[in-house]
Amino acid sequence: MDINLFDFHLPEELIAQVPLEDRETSRLMVLDRETGDIEHKHFTDILSYLHEGDCLVLNETKVMPARLHGVKEDTGAHIEVLLLKQEEGDKWETLVKPAKRVKEGTVISFGEGKLKATCTGTADQGGRQLEFSYDGIFYEILDELGEMPLPPYIKETLEDRDRYQTVYAKEIGSAAAPTAGLHFTEELLEKLKQKGVQLAFITLHVGLGTFRPVSADTIEEHHMHAEYYHMSEETAALLNRVKQNGGRIITVGTTSTRTLETIATDHDGKLCAASGWTDIFMYPGYEFKAIDGLITNFHLPKSTLIMLVSAFANRDNVLHAYNEAVKEKYRFFSFGDAMFVASHAKMRNK
């Protein structure tokens, strides 16, 4: 399948550069995945579309301030490091710039020596294995010295770090935010609970591969990056109860979707406690096994994320919705507006 089938025209001015002052004031497009019918709402209207017995699945990963600026100890040359994933102990898989200056044995100093890293291995595309040394607690030092790794299409400086975290972020380990969750406030989540909507939590640590464009000409040639996920016994039991009682499982974001669909695929359609690495790639033709609805942002043209949404809601429906979003000047990407996709979404609005 040609990746150009997932292309659309997006004016640059529609790429949201900063978050809205209030999280829940973003707009919400409601898309019926079967009919393609569209409604234009605001995010707080999600209350009208979720009902007692439904369950929202939220990714409680927390973004690391994963971008570090340091200098080579021997020459003083500036080096930028992006933490991707922790391997063993203080060893990390990273991206460095400029990569040609960092070879095995190179020592990089951050914060006037408060944190040091030695290169212990190299990989393609600027990948380097670094082993860190420090006095104290690594994540406290990282919090002091690191910057939030905003996506490359965001050019503005983020004034408030918390705006690139969900209000329920808990498990540190992501290089990017699960952005569909950024629209929820604690007050909105409380209103949903009061209405009888259940909240279930999983963890999937978002990797930088999320922002890597598909370089292959066809979908089938593309290989997804692997990301770590975890679902507890408590969450699995809750989701199975919801299913048994006729409620809907609504995932917040493509990360929650990937987690549930990975587990269901690996366990004959069942949801159970599980941890591991997933490189699941969902595109048209994939049959969903776990979810009934999806809340997600508006994604990049030709990205694996728009392919996932197209697998769930039909490519023609999704591209029509995206063209409507452009026409109606919705805000796109990480700090942009949201879409709620489900079967008979309009019919469920009470």
Swiss-Prot record:
Pathway in which this enzyme or protein is active: tRNA modification; tRNA-queuosine biosynthesis
GO molecular function: S-adenosylmethionine:tRNA ribosyltransferase-isomerase activity
EC assignment: 2.4.99.17
GO CC, alphabetical: cytoplasm
Principal EC category: transferase
One Pfam family matching this protein: Queuosine_synth
InterPro entries membership: QueA, QueA_dom1, QueA_dom2, QueA_sf
Tree of life domain: Bacteria
Location in the cell: Cytoplasm
Keywords recorded for this protein, A-Z: Cytoplasm, Queuosine biosynthesis, S-adenosyl-L-methionine, Transferase
GO biological process: queuosine biosynthetic process; tRNA wobble guanine modification
Reaction catalyzed: 7-aminomethyl-7-carbaguanosine(34) in tRNA + S-adenosyl-L-methionine = epoxyqueuosine(34) in tRNA + adenine + L-methionine + 2 H(+)
Cystine pairings recorded for this chain: none
Main location, first listed in the record: cytoplasm
Xref: PANTHER family: S-ADENOSYLMETHIONINE:TRNA RIBOSYLTRANSFERASE-ISOMERASE
Function field: Transfers and isomerizes the ribose moiety from AdoMet to the 7-aminomethyl group of 7-deazaguanine (preQ1-tRNA) to give epoxyqueuosine (oQ-tRNA).
HAMAP family, alphabetized: QueA
Oligomer status and interactors: Monomer.
Family to which this protein belongs: Belongs to the QueA family.
Protein name: S-adenosylmethionine:tRNA ribosyltransferase-isomerase
